[in-house]
Amino acid sequence: MPPKASKKDAAPAERPILGRFSSHLKIGIVGLPNVGKSTFFNIVTKLSIPAENFPFCTIDPNEARVYVPDERFDWLCQLYKPKSEVSAYLEINDIAGLVRGAHAGEGLGNAFLSHIRAVDGIFHVLRAFEDKEVTHIDDSVDPVRDLETIGEELRLKDIEFVQNKIDDLEKSMKRSNDKQLKLEHELCEKVKAHLEDGKDVRFGDWKSADIEILNTFQLLTAKPVVYLVNMSEKDYQRKKNKFLPKIHAWVQEHGGETIIPFSCAFERLLADMPPDEAAKYCAENQIASVIPKIIKTGFAAIHLIYFFTAGPDEVKCWQIRRQTKAPQAAGTIHTDFERGFICAEVMKFDDLKELGSESAVKAAGKYRQEGKTYVVQDGDIIFFKFNVSGGGKK
């Protein structure tokens, strides 16, 4: 019996997302000097996927690719017992510390800001610990001041970019009556006013057409942020930190993005222990590493999801950006799959787990056949059918 055709071929249309439309997105670690960025990156690097798993990629010393933990993936591997298991991963870039005046080229300013432009989201590491042995660039620990310093530098660089864009558009408008130039000019003026009002681009009320234009700019304040509050091991264990309430209040007033308290000192201690010893230490102290949560939160923040292909040969996560349609998702496996796309046969993970087998999912009428307009959902288990000249089906 053929799979049941879906009555609803597409999910309700969402507003376009700010950012690059790609399955190869990455997140950068940002912060002032001596806040724990490099320590955090070194901890993550210990968990990174060996370079031989990416034979056609050069991984720079300031890049790490780490597995995204997922109980669904683990369950599928238990069910199918495949010859090959391929998890999703998050690419994390370590970015040099920023100083006040970076937008004007102070310190490593220009390099720093160009590196942020090259990533798709930000892990903003904040120092919330006092240590006389670790100097602070401003001679005192004040994470809210640090938040404002970095926020202002990014906004000032965006204002500079938008002003240059306005100047270029005005020159072009003298030579052409193209309506698109006028639309872009009007948008740039709105964006500049928004930034000069102390607001980041990602919190603007932009129309779909605006977002399409903004995505060509790769503005720094358009990128999603996850705040990582680095506290002492003692504060982390007792779940109390004097700086945290003020950080929460500031973030709530400025967009309300995710805050994750953690401790580089504690995570480094765990990373240096054998796994069984680390597990025992966590159990005895009723505490756990927050690195898996940080990885999963960062992955979701840059709008990445993944679908599964599953069978006895391989269980694999295929990462795509949210709002990706079935043919483009098929193209992440092979370009022929997109070119000759016929349909996607889709199971929901929860249905498979509840019913126990593909045959049971089919018998329950929950094995769906989706067309070209279907928007792939996180955790879909998909079997693509395609046909190209001289080709076949998967």
From Swiss-Prot:
Q: Which residues make up the binding site for GTP?
A: 34-39, 129, 230, 263-265
Q: What is its EC number?
A: 3.6.5.-
Q: Which Pfam families match?
A: MMR_HSR1, YchF-GTPase_C
Which residues does the UniProt record annotate as the domain OBG-type G? 25-282
Classify the source by domain of life: Eukaryota
One GO BP annotation here? negative regulation of defense response to bacterium
Keywords in UniProt for this one?
ATP-binding, Cell membrane, Cytoplasm, GTP-binding, Hydrolase, Magnesium, Membrane, Metal-binding, Nucleotide-binding
Q: What is its main location?
A: membrane
Q: Does the keyword Magnesium apply?
A: yes
Which residues are recorded as binding Mg(2+)?
A: 38, 58
Q: Say which enzyme class the record assigns.
A: hydrolase
GO CC annotation: cytoplasm; cytosol; plasma membrane
Q: How is its activity regulated?
A: Activated by GAP1.
Q: What SUPFAM superfamilies would the database entry show? A: P-loop containing nucleoside triphosphate hydrolases, TGS-like
Question: Does the keyword section mention Amino-acid biosynthesis?
Answer: no
Annotated family? Belongs to the TRAFAC class OBG-HflX-like GTPase superfamily. OBG GTPase family. YchF/OLA1 subfamily.
NCBIfam families found in the cross-reference section:
redox-regulated ATPase YchF
Q: Its biological function?
A: Hydrolyzes ATP, and can also hydrolyze GTP with lower efficiency. Has lower affinity for GTP (Potential). Exhibits GTPase activity. Exhibits similar binding affinities and hydrolytic activities toward both GTP and ATP. Binds to the 26 S ribosomal RNA in vitro, but not to the 5.8 S or 18 S rRNA. Confers sensitivity to salinity stress by suppressing the anti-oxidation enzymatic activities and increasing lipid peroxidation thus leading to the accumulation of reactive oxygen species (ROS).
UniProt comment concerning the protein's domains: The C-terminal domain is involved in RNA binding.
Q: Which PANTHER family match?
A: OBG GTPASE FAMILY (PTHR23305), OBG-LIKE ATPASE 1 (PTHR23305:SF11)
* Assembly and interaction partners: Monomer (Potential). Interacts with GAP1.
Name of the protein in question: Obg-like ATPase 1
Q: Write down the species.
A: Oryza sativa subsp. japonica (Rice)
* Phylogenetic lineage: Eukaryota, Viridiplantae, Streptophyta, Embryophyta, Tracheophyta
